[in-house]
């Protein structure tokens, strides 16, 4: 599944695909380009560090679509990408019991959850209290955050 989380509204855009290659990722980007209003001049896309996101075909697509700007957070910082938080909610609410007859049933359940979510969509709210908790944990475990890296939770 490919998914994008609109940090302003909490709306989720999603697409299921049998494989995760550059071609499918570009198809998802095309979907985003169609569904996100043209009045949104810049679409910031936070991506994990999969090779697929940096491939030649994707880079060629990106060059032709200048309103899309890719951002790759540091390794091991997936929590900085808010769609990962949404995936966690999806996992707990719909995928805990994997009782799917087939891939089609799984895709239907995923799309149904996106529809339900978008009816009550809301942005995630990070707070400075979360930063304090992260820093306290780092102090307790002796594992300081990497230098020059943002700290959030």
Residue positions per predicted region:
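Short functional hotspots at interaction and active-site rims
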Residues: 1-153
């Amino acid at each position: 599944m490919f998914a994008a989380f609109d940090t302003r509204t909490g709306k989720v855009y999603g697409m299921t695909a049998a494989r995760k290659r550059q071609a499918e990722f570009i198809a998802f980007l095309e979907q985003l380009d169609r569904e996100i209003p043209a009045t949104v001049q810049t679409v910031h896309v936070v991506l994990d560090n999969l090779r697929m996101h940096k491939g030649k075909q994707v880079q060629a697509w990106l060059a032709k679509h200048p309103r899309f700007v890719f951002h790759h957070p540091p390794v091991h910082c997936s929590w900085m990408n808010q769609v990962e938080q949404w995936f966690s909610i999806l996992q707990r609410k719909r995928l805990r019991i994997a009782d799917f007859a087939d891939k089609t049933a799984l895709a239907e359940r995923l799309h149904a959850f996106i529809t339900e979510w978008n009816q009550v969509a809301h942005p995630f709210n990070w707070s400075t209290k979360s930063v304090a908790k992260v820093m306290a944990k780092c102090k307790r475990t002796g594992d300081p955050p990497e230098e020059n890296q943002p700290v959030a939770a």
